[in-house]
Structure formats: structure tokens, C-alpha cells
Amino acid sequence: MPEPARPATASVPVEGTLLAFDYGEKRIGVALGNTVSRSARALETIPNRSVDFRFAQISRLVGEWQPVGFVVGMPVHPDGEEQPMIKLAKRFGNQLLGRYGLPVTWVDERYSSIAAQDAGASDDVLDAEAARIILQQFFDEHA
């Protein structure tokens, strides 16, 4: 049985802004939320063109929103098995930690994209809406 995904750091921010990511090979959905209000909103979708482009966009968001931590969706299969994308999502989370030195927490995202589609999200905001669902799940689990 695979080991469950663990956060890159053990500390979960108590108060402040969080950025959440639905990592994909083509696009990265981004959501924003606050630990005090415990509410999340879809922010934007970043084309995953290259490492440099990806982190230039994320650095812009970090500068603008000054987050105290990150939440990254982990693509676990419905039966609990790890999907091939999980290695890429873990690497992405570790890159966030290395670049920004902020805590990273992973959340099981197995149905976030389906939930975003069911909520009627259009293709251009689907990934950002999935990130919002991931972040809201984080808030709900840490209430």
C-alpha cells in the first residue's frame, strides 16, 4: 500500500492568506483563501509552459497576495492508489517550499476537477475552480 501524501512541512499556518494549486502538466489552477474567514475563491489559471514561466507567474502572485503558506492538490486514484501525476505534484510542492520557504500542505484532490465540472465551471476557469475546491476542502478539514 502506498504511503499517504505528507505535507512538505508539518506546520499549518494559523492565520493569513493561502494560495492553493491544482497542478497539471498543461495548466495550473490557482485559488486564494484566508485562514480567518475560511473561504476560498478561484483566482486564475497559469499555463504550465516551462519552469521559468510557471514560477514567474507564481512569484507575481506571491508578491501580490503575500501568502503564509501553500496548499497543493494530490491526485490520488479513487481506490487510494497513487496516480503517475502524484510525483509531479509532489515535486511542484517541494519546489514551492524551496523557492519561497513557506509551508506546503497537500490535500487529496481526487474529485476536485469533477466537482468543478459539475458546478458548471467553463473550460477557461475549470482548473482555478478545482484549486478553489481543494482549498475549501483544506479549510473544512482544519476547522
UniProtKB/Swiss-Prot annotation:
Record GO biological process: rRNA 5'-end processing
Record-linked InterPro entries: RNaseH-like_sf, YqgF, YqgF/RNaseH-like_dom, YqgF/RNaseH-like_dom_sf
Protein's cellular compartments: Cytoplasm
UniProt keyword annotations, A-Z: Cytoplasm, Hydrolase, Nuclease, Ribosome biogenesis
Signal sequence region: none
CDD domains found in the cross-reference section: YqgF
UniProt keyword Disulfide bond, yes or no: no
EC number: 3.1.-.-
Gene3D superfamilies: YqgF/RNase H-like domain
GO MF entries: nuclease activity
UniProt superkingdom: Bacteria
Any single GO CC term annotated in Swiss-Prot or TrEMBL for this entry: cytosol
Main enzyme class: hydrolase
Functional note: Could be a nuclease involved in processing of the 5'-end of pre-16S rRNA.
Family membership noted in the UniProt record: Belongs to the YqgF nuclease family.
PANTHER family: POLYNUCLEOTIDYL TRANSFERASE, RIBONUCLEASE H-LIKE SUPERFAMILY PROTEIN
Classification via NCBIfam families: RNAse_H_YqgF (TIGR00250)
Name of this chain's protein: Putative pre-16S rRNA nuclease
